[in-house]
């Protein structure tokens, strides 16, 4: 078995996850990503609603097209396309989380057509940003993870760490066994949820590879914590961020 730090090298090594300039909608602000810049803007800087703040920013940048809004402020649920029924969208979502009165459920298809993503979107986004292409973050994460996962038919764990949360995908080939988001304040929180999920799925830490989406200074203690229990760590390399998490809350995401 391979041990120690490993770097995965599929065909898209170091390709950014974003293929066009994008606004990443977070809970407390947004990141603007383009090939030339990446910056975080707290909503408190605008003094208006999140949707108005984004609209104002894009107007100041004179961006009227060629931009996408990546919905990061909520995870998605994944439904196999063969089982998907558009009339049951609310039923799919109800056991997962409550839906705010200001939001509505949307769905979209994965690039490979295997799953449907169901996710909430505020009605104000549809009203105030009707022209911008909107996509759930899970759709882009899924595409990147499946590109790696389909090369190995053993079970694998993929971890996407960002400010305050981490997304956990457990896969086997092109099959998604689990996709969920968990909160974290420190490495202890992270370790608890990570190994709790692995235990629930009866995954032995020494029989499954763990992939981190990128390797970043802000999460160095998290990697070290996992290494105490699991040596077979892999990092999906992208542009490295050495900024504190307060300045780059989603370090894996670059254009």
Where are these predicted regions, by residue range?
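Hydrophobic/aromatic-enriched cytosolic interaction surfaces used to assemble or bind macromolecules
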Residues: 1-255
């Amino acid at each position: 078995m391979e041990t120690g730090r490993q770097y995965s090298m599929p065909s898209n090594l170091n390709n950014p996850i974003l293929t066009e300039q994008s606004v990443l909608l977070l809970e407390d602000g947004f990141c603007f990503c383009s090939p030339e810049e990446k910056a975080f803007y707290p909503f408190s800087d605008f003094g208006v609603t999140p949707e108005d703040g984004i609209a104002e920013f894009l107007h100041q940048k004179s961006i009227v097209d060629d931009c996408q809004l990546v919905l990061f402020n909520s995870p998605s649920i994944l439904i196999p396309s063969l089982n998907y029924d558009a009339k049951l969208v609310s039923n799919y979502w109800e056991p997962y989380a409550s839906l705010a009165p200001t939001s509505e459920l949307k769905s979209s298809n994965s690039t490979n057509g295997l799953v449907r993503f169901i996710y909430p979107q505020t009605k104000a986004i549809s009203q105030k940003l009707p022209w911008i292409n909107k996509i759930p973050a899970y759709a882009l994460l899924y595409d990147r993870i499946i590109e790696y996962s389909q090369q190995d038919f053993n079970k694998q764990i993929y971890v996407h760490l960002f400010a305050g949360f981490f997304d956990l995908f457990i896969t086997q080939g092109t099959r998604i066994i689990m996709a969920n988001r968990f909160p974290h304040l420190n490495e202890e929180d992270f370790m608890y949820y990570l190994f709790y999920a692995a235990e629930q799925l009866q995954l032995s830490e020494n029989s499954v590879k763990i992939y981190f989406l990128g390797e970043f200074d802000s999460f160095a203690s998290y990697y070290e914590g996992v290494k105490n229990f699991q040596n077979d760590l892999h990092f999906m390399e992208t542009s490295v961020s050495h900024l504190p998490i307060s300045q780059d809350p989603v370090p894996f995401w670059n254009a």
